[in-house]
Amino acid sequence: MNPSEMQRKAPPRRRRHRNRAPLTHKMNKMVTSEEQMKLPSTKKAEPPTWAQLKKLTQLATKYLENTKVTQTPESMLLAALMIVSMVSAGVPNSSEETATIENGP
């Protein structure tokens, strides 16, 4: 091998983005109105009752106890969000307690 072959080659340079203006221009053209955001499947929901919130808190506490996770405000919030998302997604659960949140007390 001659010395020129032994030299380490520099990595290829990354290409710089030319002009971001076209992307910005496209985003400016996108108009999202409230009417566009509402889907036919969107339903108006009533605010939860105190009884529903209490039941949700109880279910979240029970879930954290079953999974042996320390009960902190953060873990309670995540457990509550998990329960709400499971109920709204219609995930089947053998527990009748989860259905109580969906249907009310």
From Swiss-Prot:
GO biological process per UniProt: mRNA export from nucleus; positive regulation of gene expression; protein homooligomerization
Locus of motif Nuclear localization signal: 13-20
Positions with biased composition (Basic residues): 10-20
Membrane-spanning intervals of the chain: none
Tissue-specific expression: Expressed at higher level in placenta, expressed at lower level in several organs and cell lines.
Record's subcellular location: Cytoplasm; Nucleus, Nucleolus
Region described as Disordered: spans on this chain: 1-49
UniProt GO molecular function: protein homodimerization activity; RNA binding; RNA stem-loop binding
Impact upon substituting residue 18 to A: Total loss of function and dominant negative effect
Alphabetized UniProt keyword annotations: Cytoplasm, ERV, mRNA transport, Nucleus, RNA-binding, Transport, Transposable element
Miscellaneous remark of the record: Despite functional similarity, Rec shares almost no sequence homology with HIV-1 Rev and HTLV-1 Rex.
Role: Retroviral replication requires the nuclear export and translation of unspliced, singly-spliced and multiply-spliced derivatives of the initial genomic transcript. Rec interacts with a highly structured RNA element (RcRE) present in the viral 3'LTR and recruits the cellular nuclear export machinery. This permits export to the cytoplasm of unspliced genomic or incompletely spliced subgenomic viral transcripts.
Official protein name in the record: Endogenous retrovirus group K member 6 Rec protein
Native species: Homo sapiens (Human)
